[in-house]
Amino acid sequence: MNIPAPRKDLMIVNMGPHHPSMHGVLRLIVTLDGEDVIDCEPILGYLHRGMEKIAENRTIIQYLPYVTRWDYLATMFTEAITINGPELLGNIQVPKRASYIRAIMLELSRIASHLLWLGPFLADIGAQTPFFYIFRERELVYDLFEAATGMRMMHNFFRIGGVAADLPHGWIDKCLDFCDYFLIGVTEYQKLITRNPIFLERVEGVGVIGREEVINWGLSGPMLRASGIQWDLRKVDHYECYDEFDWEVQWQKEGDSLARYLVRIGEMTESIKIIQQALEGIPGGPYENLEIRYFDRERNPEWNDFDYRFISKKPSPTFELPKQELYVRVEAPKGELGIFLIGDQSGFPWRWKIRPPGFINLQILPQLVKRMKLADIMTILGSIDIIMGEVDR
């Protein structure tokens, strides 16, 4: 009888690249010994579009429609960071009402991003039902976005000195109704998922990152807070009007995939608390700093000509960026989204460096999956939460 000799050589498997609507165009070259992962090499760049170079050849307002293509599931944050930098460089005051509207939109965008992380993450580890539930709630968020901004996804809503338009009549009541409904939905998720023994078996103790490790790798967002560090830029940097609201930083100390899930679920509840307080306390007044329009009036005398008087043009603030450098950041759903900006007395930035949270957080993936099983790769990758638009830029 011929007994087949056991194989001793390793197997190399390509995972991805998938379609951008799925996990994105990330390719993993995985070296396997049976079911055990020996090595994992991520291959990036399939969605690279030169976003930093495009920024250096556009004014800020011209560049705004591009930025929503970085993290296309949390577009409000990319818009916020794009206008926060020039506002700080130009020392531009933002009206209180505009700041409240921005905070509401940012937190709604955080909820939408976390929802679209939760559904596919659970589908990857075998739970199909929540995938349909999260789309039910996400549609309600997108309906609110559509009513306020005119677009469901690529909003192009933030402006230097404020926002593009005021909230429409009846929108605040509609948003408050959503908040009440969504809190019940989150409770339903927790009953369905958090104590599920099959779910716990797949995520508990998988992809553990220690406190020292998470700092050394420069991780941020839920990845950082799930490892026992209470660091949230909304509390640290005091941007927009977050200091005026009562809310708690969500954190866990275990550092595994379950801890990252619990942080994100908790953040959705805290976002609802912030939105409710902002809606109830939103002040009156202008939604945009109109003085911005006069920054560059001398450079465009044709706007004052007789021919242009009867064209309803809304001049955009193409002011000069002063000769300074600045790093500005916001707490995006995936972590610290930052921009290093250098001005040189022109309408275009001299340097526009993006610090994407997904790219930094993805660095630790090869280390996390080593000595794990093949099936754990999707659990760990899902718990990191990446969008290839911002990873590749």
UniProtKB/Swiss-Prot annotation:
Main location: plastid
SUPFAM superfamilies xref list: HydB/Nqo4-like
GO cellular component: chloroplast thylakoid membrane
Keyword Transport: yes
Keywords, in A-Z order: Chloroplast, Membrane, NAD, NADP, Plastid, Plastoquinone, Quinone, Thylakoid, Translocase, Transport
Function recorded in the entry: NDH shuttles electrons from NAD(P)H:plastoquinone, via FMN and iron-sulfur (Fe-S) centers, to quinones in the photosynthetic chain and possibly in a chloroplast respiratory chain. The immediate electron acceptor for the enzyme in this species is believed to be plastoquinone. Couples the redox reaction to proton translocation, and thus conserves the redox energy in a proton gradient.
This protein's name: NAD(P)H-quinone oxidoreductase subunit H, chloroplastic
Species this protein is from: Morus indica (Mulberry)
Recorded name of the encoding gene: ndhH
